[in-house]
Amino acid sequence: MEKNDYKKIVASCFCSMMLVSSVWAQESDLYAGGTGSKSDPYLIETEAQFDAVRENRGSYFKLMADLDFASYEKEGGWWPLGEWGSGDGSDQRFSGTFDGNGHKISNLMAKHGDDTGAHDMSVFGVVDGGTIRNLLLDNVTVIGGGRLGILTGLTRNATIEQVGVINSSCSNIGTGSNSSGLVGPCAGTTVITDCYTADCNVMAKSTDGETGDAVGGIVSSGNATVMYCYCLLYTSDAADDKA
C-alpha cells in the first residue's frame, strides 16, 4: 500500500469517528444523561427534555424529577410524542420504553392550536410496541377529535403498567370519536396492568351535538388485556360507555 493511500484511509476513519461523535453529542445534549439503551436510558429532568423524547421514539427513557408544564410554552401547543405519520408511519410512533420512576407530570394541555379535530391527542399519542410505566399524570387536559386518551391515543402491542391519572379531562369533539381517561383505542396484544384513573372527566361529543362512539375510564375501545385496574368518579357522554 502506498503511503498516500494509507493517509487517505486514516483520514477517512478519523472523519467517520468525528461524525459519530458529533451525532452522539447532539443527542446527549437533548437529555440529562444516558445513551438511550436499556442499561443506560436517557435521563429526563426538565419539561424540554421530556418534549425531546420525540427525537428518539424507539429508545429507553427514565424520568428523574416531577415535571410541571404550567409555564411551559410551545408554539401551537403540545403535540403528542408519537404520531401516525405518513405512509406506514412506523418511524414516528412511540415504540420505546418510558419509565416514570414514580414521578409526576402535571398541568399539561394537549391541544394543538385551533385544530380541535386533531387525532391521537394525548401525552404520548400513537404507541406501537412501546412500554410506559411508573408514572402519574395530574391535571392534564386533552382536547381533539378521533382517537383520544389522556395518556395515549391509538395504542397497539403496548405495555402500560402502574400509571395513574388524576384530576384530568379528555374532551373529544370530533365525529366518530373515542375518548378515555387513560388509553385510547387498543389493538394487537396491548396489556394494561395496575393502572387507575380518578376524578377525571371524559367526554365524546361532536360539534354538531351528536354523541361520540365510545368512552372509557381505562380504555375507550378495541382489544386489550386489562388487569388490576380501577376507575373512580368519571363522567362521560357517548353512545357506547365502556367505563
Regions found by a protein language model. Give the residues of each.
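Bacterial N-terminal signal peptides that target proteins for export
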Residues: 2-13
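Bacterial N-terminal signal peptides
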Residues: 12-21
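Surface-exposed repetitive/solenoidal architectures
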Residues: 24-236
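A short, hydrophobic C-terminal helix/tail in secreted or cell-surface proteins
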Residues: 237-243
